[in-house]
């Protein structure tokens, strides 16, 4: 417990919070060749490799992930949600924040139905999360 005198002299330091998705909070100015701090909801990037990963201990699967080089120069691992995808090397994708709990190092999701990423086929429920259009009657 600090004394009143200590608080008057120094005051309390506010806690610093670490970002869950740091790649979204960094912008690159190619003219000045410098980085600026500005948050953005999504970022565009190019797939450098598309592969599968195995999840942590109690789970078992082959989860589809892509290594993406973003417009700010950072390279991140991002998850490809849904069943089936059309992504390959050099595909242009849009990523959003959001980690995958059982894949270490995967902090981002690829947005389905945006840019080169196709929507999930034959999806009836939760369509907005997978870029699927409303089916014709």
Swiss-Prot record:
Residue ranges that the Swiss-Prot or TrEMBL entry lists as coiled coil: none
Superkingdom field: Bacteria
Molecular function terms from GO: rRNA binding; structural constituent of ribosome; tRNA binding
UniProtKB keywords: Methylation, Ribonucleoprotein, Ribosomal protein, RNA-binding, rRNA-binding, tRNA-binding
Signal sequence extent: none
UniProt cross-references to InterPro entries, sorted A to Z: NA-bd_OB-fold, Ribosomal_uS12, Ribosomal_uS12_bac
GO biological process: translation
Residue(s) carrying 3-methylthioaspartic acid: 102
GO cellular component: small ribosomal subunit
Region (Disordered): 1-25
Family: Belongs to the universal ribosomal protein uS12 family.
Subunit-level organization: Part of the 30S ribosomal subunit. Contacts proteins S8 and S17. May interact with IF1 in the 30S initiation complex.
Described function: With S4 and S5 plays an important role in translational accuracy. Interacts with and stabilizes bases of the 16S rRNA that are involved in tRNA selection in the A site and with the mRNA backbone. Located at the interface of the 30S and 50S subunits, it traverses the body of the 30S subunit contacting proteins on the other side and probably holding the rRNA structure together. The combined cluster of proteins S8, S12 and S17 appears to hold together the shoulder and platform of the 30S subunit.
Name of the featured protein: Small ribosomal subunit protein uS12
Naturally occurring in which organism (per UniProt): Finegoldia magna (strain ATCC 29328 / DSM 20472 / WAL 2508) (Peptostreptococcus magnus)
Lineage: Bacteria, Bacillati, Bacillota, Tissierellia, Tissierellales
